[in-house]
Amino acid sequence: MMRWRNNQYKTQKQHKSDYSTAEKQDQDVLTGNIGYDLEHVKRKIGHNGDVHFRELEITQLHVKAALIFVEGLSDQDLINKGLSVLVMNQPNQVSDEISQSGKGILTSKQIKNQIVSIGDVIDSEKISDIVLNVFMGSTALLIDGIPQAFLLGTVKKQNRSIEEPLSEALVRGPRTGFTEELSTNTALLRQQGKNDQLTLQRFEVGTRLKKDLIIAYMNDIADPKVVEEVRKRVRGIEIDHLPESGYVEQLIEDNYLSPFPQVQSTERPDRVISGLMEGRVAILLDGTPFALIVPVTFSMMLQSPEDYYERWFPSSLIRLLRFIAAMITLFAPALYISFISFHPGLIPTKLAISISGTRQGVPFPSLIEALFMEVAIEILREAGLRLPKPIGPAIGIVGGLIIGEAAVQAGIVSPIMVIVVALTAISSFAIPHYSTGIALRMLRFGAMFCAAVFGLFGVIMYYLLLSSHVVKLKSFGVPYASPAVPYHLKDWKDFVIRMPLLVMKRRPKMMNTDNTKRVK
């Protein structure tokens, strides 16, 4: 008996739930009664003062209509021009075909052809679609007797002009950079060259505040498995809002615990196109000038577009300098600590005597000395970034000089320590990719602690630990340490040394591209 009652209760509860769901679905659908529909839309939108409801009438047909748009998001001039029959109250522009056909009854086709002169028009019967599109800048047109709304593309373009990227300045190369407007960025990609294989696939991301996202790839070059993996990860993004592409980067990367960036960010359209021509995939998000490129390797983070715009010999030397600068950034303070504290015998005698003389009177061990200067430099660097542009760089340079000189005169640090820290800071600026530079700067503190505890052996152990991590790391299935591990001899033509373009006839083997030949 009790089981029967429980089953009956569950059945009644299920019927109530189904009825409630059906009722909600009915409430989300337009009825064609403009007064009733407007009340439902207003209730759905809530108390938003920037949303305008403009009730009008097509006087020649005696049909009521209404416009719904957001002030500032919708282009008023475009609304006035595209809906001049309604907005400007010009009934004489309604053709006789409409006024005579169907005894004054408008059809969807007639509205699009005779009343609306805006090209981008979408039909929808759902109130939720109306609210969503209105808050994205569209204008909703409701007409009495028609149980559907016409969503007009009246988004007001508020983008800045195309400028040179601030974070990737070049001596030689294009001066164009991405903007915050997605349509402008896709146009910049198209303008890089005529090619019918450039594919731009659009997605919608964000569970509450929705944004457009585009993945770009060369259809005849990119590995289909990589493209499908990018699609899968983009579809798997479930977050309220994506204000910047950095959110996308953190949500799609392979190992979120790794200090190394596994996605390359760039403001340069030429760099994106170069990546696409190698078989990579680009991700562009509306509202940010930074595009993402996947898959990537560690060596890519030390490369600059200018490497390919200059001749191969100077480009190779400069690239080699960047690799050396990366090692200096990571290990210079640690090597100083290990040599001073554990292995002074490895230093040449004259240099050891000179260093010993400069350290007389310094009350702190080499680790504390190095930490003090490194932290001071990082604070100055951060302060220089946050201060206004006219005074930011000056504060960083002058502040570093003053603090270094004052610390030496006070006997807190030695002059050789100031030289080491300055060399480390300058070397970090030679790294083209900002996120990689930050990673190396933070990782050097770990190397310093290992050097303070175990000396040179600690530095070697730390290097092996980082190397093993980099070797295990992957970016969308591509080994992060390629082409060193796994070993691809042909890809070494564009590794530490950049060989002449006539020698680099094929695309990177690690990308597993369908079309491998790029120079005939």
Curated annotation (Swiss-Prot):
The keyword Transmembrane helix applies. It comes from the Bacteria. Keywords: Cell membrane, Membrane, Transmembrane, Transmembrane helix. It is a multi-pass membrane protein. One of its GO terms (biological process) is spore germination. It holds the Pfam family GerA. It is found in: Cell membrane. Its main location: membrane. GO terms for cellular component: plasma membrane. Residues 1-11 have a biased composition (Polar residues). PANTHER family: LEUCINE ZIPPER PROTEIN 4, SPORE GERMINATION PROTEIN. Belongs to the GerABKA family. This is Uncharacterized membrane protein YndD. It comes from Bacillus subtilis (strain 168). The lineage of its organism: Bacteria, Bacillati, Bacillota, Bacilli, Bacillales.
